[in-house]
Amino acid sequence: MGVISPTETLFLKSQHRLLQPRNYSYALAFHSTRRVANFPRNSFSSLGSCSVDFPLRSNPISQNSKSIHPWRRYVSESDSNELYHKKVSSIMETLKQAYSFIPHGILLSTILALVYPPSFTWFKPRYFVPGLGFMMFAVGINSNERDFLEALKRPDAIFAGYIGQYLIKPLLGYIFGVIAVSLFNLPTSIGAGIMLVSCVSGAQLSNYTTFLTDPSLAALSIVMTSISTATAVLVTPMLSLLLIGKKLPVDVFGMISSILQVVITPIAAGLLLNRLFPRLSNAIKPFLPALTVIDMSCCIGAPLALNIDSILSPFGATILFLVITFHLLAFVAGYFFTGFFFSKAPDVKALQRTISYETGMQSSLLALALATKFFQDPLVGVPPAISTVVMSLMGVSLVTIWKNRKE
């Protein structure tokens, strides 16, 4: 019988304890499967050291965990939190980029209104004011008081916008009204309707299109439209008398109420929210683009659906052609008129786009209301009804074109 070495003696004395070793508090990794490993029986060498036949890796664990595999909860919570934040960031970024879907929304609403008018007939004219007001709120919440103070320091640009709205556009309206009657043999009431569109104030939608293209000039656009709307109580009746031969009284209190509801109140609300509750304002901003796309789609699809009979009338195609050409030339005239007189301005391109919107987009809804109230012939209201849709689609299309060129 050989002599037992000290190491073997230690092993024999300790064998009853080594058969069932205790679990260690750190985790061991076996390939891709993570587990807390017990040491096997024959895991000791002749030197008494611990050895295993697979790679070991320690992982951080939760100290207060009651689970036999606490690292599992740690890893799953960490991964799930990271995944959650990534999803939230992705959703927020998509919402912020919703403005890029405006052309798709407009096209979809136009097709729906033509194919199935009841899809938009629920959006009655009484909803137009709050609908436009919501767009102005989106402009206000993304602006500040300094923008409007800077806009008031540019009286020459404001005057140029006024000339575009009440000189260039009425001149084009008169020309196209005469062309409609003399060259296309359309009824006189159709020509009067085209002229009526050119006599009204600028459209509030022009403020929003300017905001999408050149946010720094949105306040200037708002000032231009507000001044043209405020003075429409005097200018529109005079222009209608000069061009159509009929003086149309405009409701002064109605115009003031319209400015307050559509422009001043929502913009002031947005500015105040920015100033007094910045955290709430920042929480709301990511959702506004998507909501505005839906709002704008309704404001454009509804007039088309509500006036579908006029648009599909025997004169509809000819009137559509005339109205498209009329607005197109107005956009072009406003653009080059501004470029000629403000060629040395540092922001001449942005200013050209802004005044182009102001010249090309008139308040066709106001023209439609005047035609319905003061003219017995319903055909007078056909050009304003078509103009509402055409003007909006052309303005939004220009937003897409100009934004892509800027980028």
From Swiss-Prot:
This is Probable sodium/metabolite cotransporter BASS5, chloroplastic. Its main location: membrane. Residues 1-57 form a transit peptide. Coiled coil: none annotated. Disruption phenotype: No visible phenotype under normal growth conditions, but plants contain reduced levels of aliphatic glucosinolates. GO terms for molecular function: monocarboxylic acid transmembrane transporter activity. PANTHER family: SODIUM-BILE ACID COTRANSPORTER, SODIUM_METABOLITE COTRANSPORTER BASS5, CHLOROPLASTIC-RELATED. It comes from Arabidopsis thaliana (Mouse-ear cress). Widely expressed. The chain crosses the membrane at residues 101-121, 122-142, 162-184, 191-213, 222-242, 252-272, 286-306, 317-337, 379-399. Plastidic transporter involved in the biosynthesis of aliphatic glucosinolates by translocating the biosynthetic intermediates of Met-derived glucosinolates across chloroplast membranes. Transports short chain (C2) alpha-keto acids, such as 4-methylsulfanyl-2-oxobutanoic acid, from the cytosol to the chloroplast where they are subjected to chain elongation cycles. Also functions in the transport of chain-elongated (C3 to C8) Met derivatives from the chloroplast to the cytosol. Does not seem to be involved in the transport of indole-derived glucosinolates. InterPro entries: BilAc:Na_symport/Acr3 (IPR002657), Bilac:Na_transpt (IPR004710), Na+/solute_symporter_sf (IPR038770).
